[in-house]
Amino acid sequence: ASLIYEDRFGPNGHSSEDIETVPTSEIPKHDLLCGGFPCQDYSVATTLKNSKGLIGKKGVLWWSIHRILSEIKDKPTFLFLENVDRLLKSPSSQRGRDFAVMLQSLNDLGYAVEWRVINAADYGMPQRRRRVFFLGYKKDSKVYKQLKKSTPIDWLLKDGVIQNTFKAEQDSEVSEFVLDNDLVDISNNFNVGGKKSLFENTGMMIDGEVTTLKTFSVYKGKPTPLKSILEKGKVDEEFSIPKSELPQWKYLKGAKSEERVSADGYVYKYAEGSMVFPDDLDQPSRTIITSE
């Protein structure tokens, strides 16, 4: 990823240092903190049951963001954070607990937060990529004051920053609840035994009060199909599938429900759904790896 950033934007202003090792005294003053902490523990490439969230080795990198916001004197006015949408349901034993911990952490640090799950293809992009984006506003900011004057529903469906960029309409009843202000209690007790997360794909939190609801995207532009971005011309042979391998590819991409044997001799039932093969050029590209 670091090499790609350098190639696209040049080496100036780019750093590949581990943020966990950088003293906050060396981080310059900034108005906007952007972060996309690793998603291996939340990704749809693994099952929810195996997701470790904040407990997992990768998930704890969230606390690097928390450390910066806790230690620097002049906190950034705005936060722009992103993760896979599975974050709203993680971990499997306490649906939504990890996101609740993050929201309460940001509340403790003096921020209001709004979030939305956005699929890039729903707004004209050439890839089906679903991610949750959450924006934070410091309590002394102009946006926070505007949010405070508005009602949660007006903000989420009319006045909010996300809504004014990515239009959406209400698709469910509104749910409201208050987060416990003790992070340890949230970590231990939030939604224990709950089969469904309390967080929908759209919502906001201000002063610990959460408002959340389902929305659906509203986009009046044209979709961008995969064929419109593919390079024209001869395709190198290394990217071609020999005809002799097509049956194997069709099997791998097809639906399955079969018995398999593990390395230690355990017989188990393996099942998975099918994937389109070959990819439909008239549709936006599927998400690489996770195949949404």
What are the language-model segments listed below?
Residues 125-203:
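Flexible, glycine-/basic-rich loop-and-beta segments that form/coincide
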Residues 102, 114, 128-132, 284:
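Residues that flank catalytic or metal-binding motifs in active/ligand-binding sites
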Residues 100-117, 138-142:
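A SAM-dependent methyltransferase catalytic signature shared across enzymes that methylate proteins
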Residues 14-17, 85, 111-122:
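Conserved S-adenosyl-L-methionine
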Residues 78:
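Short glycine-centered segments of the SAM/dcSAM-binding site in methyltransferase folds
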Residues 1-75, 83-99, 107:
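Core alpha/beta nucleotide-donor-binding catalytic domains of modification enzymes
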Residues 38-42, 85-86, 121-124, 139-141, ...:
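Short, solvent-exposed loop/turn segments at secondary-structure junctions
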Residues 203-292:
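C-terminal target-recognition/interaction regions appended to catalytic cores
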